[in-house]
Amino acid sequence: MNRLPKILVSCPTASAKNYTALEWMLNTQKFTYPNYDVIVFDNTDDNGSNADYLNELAISNGILNYQAIHYSTNKHESIIERMCISHNHARELAINNNYSHLFHLESDVICPIDTLQNLYIHNKSVCGGLYYRDSGISRKLMAQRRIYRSSRNVATENFLPNEDIDFIDGNLKTIAAIGLGCVLIDLKTLKKIQFRFMPNVDLHSDSYFSEDCFRNNIKIFADTNIICKHNNENWDLYGLNWK
C-alpha cells in the first residue's frame, strides 16, 4: 500500500503567542492524518531564547514531532514583514524538502483533529477551514466572498453579520479569500506563488496570497464543516488586554 505523502505543518510564531503555545502543540500531535512534520518559525526579536523555550516546552510535555526555528530579525522590520518572512521560510522548507503540501495553521488557531485529513481528501490546490476573529457583535468570519459588479469590477468583501450562518452549511465551497489561519496549500501552488507584502500598507501576506491565487486562476475552497477555535477571540481569558 502506498504511503500517504508527508505534509509540512507550519506557521510564524513569537513570544506574544506563548499563552497558547502548549495547546497548539498538543492539538497538532492528535491529527488523524498519519504523515506530517510540525516546524514553526519564531520571529521574536531576541537571540533565539524563545525558540529554545518552545522546544523545551514541547520536550517536557512529551511532544516529539515539533521544532521551533528562530531567525535573526531586523529591529526595523514591521510585524507584517516579519510574518511574511516566516511564511516564506515555511514555503521554502516545503519546496526544498519535497513536502506534498504546506498546512498553514496559525499559532493561535486550534483545529479539529481530522482537519488535515479532510482537507487533503478534498484534493484541491488551496483548501481551508473556517474560524472567527473577536467575539460578540464584533465577531467576524475570517473569509471573504467575491463580488462581480461587472467584467472590469471584481472585488472581495467580508460577510455581513449573520450572513455567515447561511454560508456555513457543511459543504465545500469556493471563496475569494480564506486567510492563512487554517489552510492546506499544495506544492504546485507554493512553487507558483511567493508570499509578499507591501511596505507601509496595512495588509498581511494572506491578503496578497488570495489575490495572487485569483490572478493565477487558482480556486480557493472552504470546507464549511470545519470550524476552528481562535484563541484571540477573547484574550482577557489569558490575562492579556491587547491584540
Segments (PLM) and residue ranges:
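Conserved catalytic core of nucleotide-sugar-dependent glycosyltransferases
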Residues: 112-198
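Cell-envelope/extracellular polymer assembly enzymes that use nucleotide-activated donors
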Residues: 6-10, 37, 208
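Short, acidic, metal-binding catalytic loop of nucleotide-sugar glycosyltransferases
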Residues: 24-36
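N-proximal low-complexity "stem/linker" segments adjacent to membrane-targeting elements
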Residues: 1-27
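Short beta-strand-to-loop acidic/aromatic patch adjacent to the donor-nucleotide binding site
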Residues: 98-110
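Active-site-proximal specificity loops/subdomain of glycosyltransferases
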Residues: 47-99
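Short beta-strand/loop segment that forms part of the nucleotide-sugar
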Residues: 35-46, 70-71
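C-terminal catalytic/acceptor-binding lobe
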Residues: 172, 177-182, 187-243
